[in-house]
Each structure stands twice: as C-alpha cells, then as structure tokens.
C-alpha cells in the first residue's frame, strides 16, 4: 500500500508538471519576465539619445586625436611628406630631360 501512495504522489506531481508545460525551478512562480522582444527599440532615421558622459567622451577623444595628428604633422612632417630633398630643376641636364642637342639636325 505504501508503494501505491508513493506512486500516486509521483503521478500527481508529474501531472502538474505536464499541465504547466515546463518544469518549475525554485522561486520561479511560473511567470517569465524576460520577454522575447527587443530591449532597445530601434528608431528609423533618428539619432540615438546620448548621455552627457558619452558626448563628453566623444569630444575629448576626437580632440585628442586631432591634437595628435596635427602635433605629429607639425613636428614630424617628413613622415607624411617624405624626407627626400626636393630636386632643383635648374641643375637638370638636357640629356636627363630628353631634350636633343642644338647642333643635331
């Protein structure tokens, strides 16, 4: 008889789990609060709402970037423009420029 009562209690619990559709966990209460939707709704062709700290950080880092670019360009311009001396065209010969000699006709 005790086996029969034990079996009946398992059947009762199993029936509850079968009817609920899923097994319950401790402290669950049977309600799922997460939902399946998007947490941040996208807004078509609208700028996102920025916080003051995001605006400050973006302006700070963009200012730092431009400072670094202009500083390096001013002090190490050879890195951008090249470090070779610009050739003086007055010192080129006619032969180097591909100009035939005057006495040749």
Curated annotation (Swiss-Prot):
The keyword Electron transport applies. One of its GO terms (cellular component) is respiratory chain complex I. Residues 85-105 are annotated as: Disordered. Its main location: mitochondrion. InterPro entries: NDUFB2_animal (IPR026627). Keywords: Electron transport, Membrane, Mitochondrion, Mitochondrion inner membrane, Respiratory chain, Transit peptide, Transport. It comes from Pan troglodytes (Chimpanzee). It is a peripheral membrane protein. Signal peptide: none annotated. Belongs to the complex I NDUFB2 subunit family. Complex I is composed of 45 different subunits. PANTHER family: NADH DEHYDROGENASE [UBIQUINONE] 1 BETA SUBCOMPLEX SUBUNIT 2, MITOCHONDRIAL (PTHR15223:SF1), NADH-UBIQUINONE OXIDOREDUCTASE AGGG SUBUNIT (PTHR15223). One of its GO terms (biological process) is mitochondrial respiratory chain complex I assembly. It comes from the Eukaryota. Residues 1-33 form a transit peptide. Pfam families: NADH_B2. It is found in: Mitochondrion inner membrane. Accessory subunit of the mitochondrial membrane respiratory chain NADH dehydrogenase (Complex I), that is believed not to be involved in catalysis. Complex I functions in the transfer of electrons from NADH to the respiratory chain. The immediate electron acceptor for the enzyme is believed to be ubiquinone. Residues 93-105 have a biased composition (Acidic residues). This is NADH dehydrogenase [ubiquinone] 1 beta subcomplex subunit 2, mitochondrial.
């Amino acid at each position: 008889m005790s086996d029969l009562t034990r079996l009946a209690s398992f059947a009762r619990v199993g029936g509850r789990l079968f009817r609920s559709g899923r097994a319950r966990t401790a402290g669950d209460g049977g309600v799922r609060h997460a939902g399946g939707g998007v947490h941040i709704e996208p807004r078509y062709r609208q700028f996102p709402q920025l916080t003051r700290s995001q605006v400050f950080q973006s302006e700070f880092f963009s200012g730092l970037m431009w400072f670094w670019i202009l500083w390096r360009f001013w002090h190490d311009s050879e890195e951008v423009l090249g470090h070779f001396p610009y050739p003086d065209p007055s010192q080129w010969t006619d032969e180097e420029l591909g100009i035939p000699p005057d006495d040749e006709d």
